[in-house]
Structures are given as structure tokens and as C-alpha cells.
């Protein structure tokens, strides 16, 4: 099969100065001309980081609903090292023209991750944790799929930094 090299739009590494200990390098993207499957390998140096990927068409990100078919070392916290990989199946996720696709790989500190966290509760993958930017970006067609009632626990971040709150009743009760 003939492999098409995809341009890497960005190695978007948006870490603050205090978190600049992680970086992505040796990023290689290819796309199989027959199956349209996109494959990527990369190296993460420094601290563990949350690695996410974004698909762009004509420089614009596609809707999160089409990103559910990423597999591998993506949408999760990844330890530093070489040989990390991910793949995306546009033939299953996105009906658009595959020739205009570029991809953006991004590493962030785990505490700065996206709003949605999914814990796999199935026996063979118990404890597998993935992160997603929106409910629409969840695999299997989104939050309304029954898999999120039986095999996967979806949690949404509640921004509460600096908020003082008490749990329980006061001592006078």
C-alpha cells in the first residue's frame, strides 16, 4: 500500500513555563491510501503528560463527534519515552475528504486536561482512563450510547479552583 505523508500542522505543546518539562518530538504521521487509516508515532520527553490529537480540515478543527475513533497512546496520560503510537480511522469516524486532513498533537499537564474523563469498568480494561474535550467527542456515538450506562463511567470536571465549601452539617446540629 502506498503511504501518504501527512503534514503536521503543529506540535502544539502548550505548557506554561512551570510545566515546560514535557515535550513532543520525532512525530511522524502517515495515511494508508486504501484504508484511509492514519498512523502516528512520537516521543515524549520530560514528565508524564496528557497527549491529545486534533484533526483539522483546511486549518479548521472538525467537530468533536468525529474524533471518537482514536486508539493507542492518545487521550490519556502518557509516560515519557519513545515509541508511542496512535491511529485514527476516518473511514469509521468522518465522511469527509481525507486528502485535506492535517493533524495537531498536543501535550499538557495532566491537571490541565479536558473536561471529560472516562473510566473503563469492563473486566478486560478495568481502570483504563481516557480524556475528551466534550460529550460529543466520546467514542461510540456520544454519551447517549448504552456503553456509558454499563461499561464506562463518564465524569465531567467542575471548575472549583479557589472555591471554599463545607461538607456535612455544622457542629451545632
Predicted segments, located by residue:
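Short, compositionally biased
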Residues: 19-22, 102-173
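Extracellular acidic, Ser/Thr/Pro-rich low-complexity tracts
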Residues: 43-48, 57-59, 92
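Short glycine/proline/serine/threonine-rich loop/turn segments at secondary-structure transition edges
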Residues: 78, 92-101
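Short, compositionally biased P/S/T/A/G/V-rich stretches that sit at domain boundaries
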Residues: 19-33
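Short proline/glycine-enriched turn/loop motifs at strand-loop junctions of beta-rich domains
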Residues: 45-50, 160-163
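Bacterial N-terminal signal peptides that target proteins for export
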Residues: 1-8
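Solvent-exposed serine/threonine-rich low-complexity stretches and specific carbohydrate-binding patches
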Residues: 63-79
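Structural beta-strand segments of beta-rich domains
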Residues: 36-40
Amino acid at each position: 500500500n502506498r503511504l501518504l505523508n501527512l503534514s503536521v500542522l503543529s506540535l502544539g505543546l502548550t505548557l506554561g513555563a512551570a510545566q515546560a518539562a514535557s515535550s513532543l518530538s520525532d512525530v511522524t504521521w502517515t495515511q494508508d491510501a486504501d484504508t484511509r487509516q492514519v498512523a502516528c508515532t512520537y516521543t515524549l520527553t520530560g514528565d508524564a503528560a496528557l497527549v491529545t490529537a486534533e484533526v483539522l480540515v483546511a486549518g479548521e478543527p472538525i467537530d468533536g463527534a468525529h474524533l471518537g475513533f482514536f486508539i493507542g497512546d492518545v487521550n490519556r496520560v502518557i509516560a515519557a519515552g519513545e515509541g508511542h503510537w496512535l491511529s485514527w480511522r476516518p473511514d469509521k469516524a468522518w465522511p469527509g475528504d481525507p486528502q485535506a486532513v492535517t493533524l495537531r498533537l498536543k501535550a499538557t499537564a495532566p491537571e490541565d486536561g479536558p473536561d471529560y474523563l472516562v473510566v473503563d469498568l469492563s473486566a478486560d480494561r478495568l481502570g483504563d482512563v481516557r480524556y475528551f474535550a466534550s460529550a460529543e467527542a466520546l467514542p461510540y456515538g456520544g454519551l447517549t450510547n448504552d456503553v456509558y450506562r454499563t461499561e464506562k463511567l463518564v465524569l465531567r470536571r467542575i471548575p472549583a479552583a479557589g472555591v471554599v465549601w463545607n461538607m456535612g452539617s455544622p457542629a451545632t446540629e
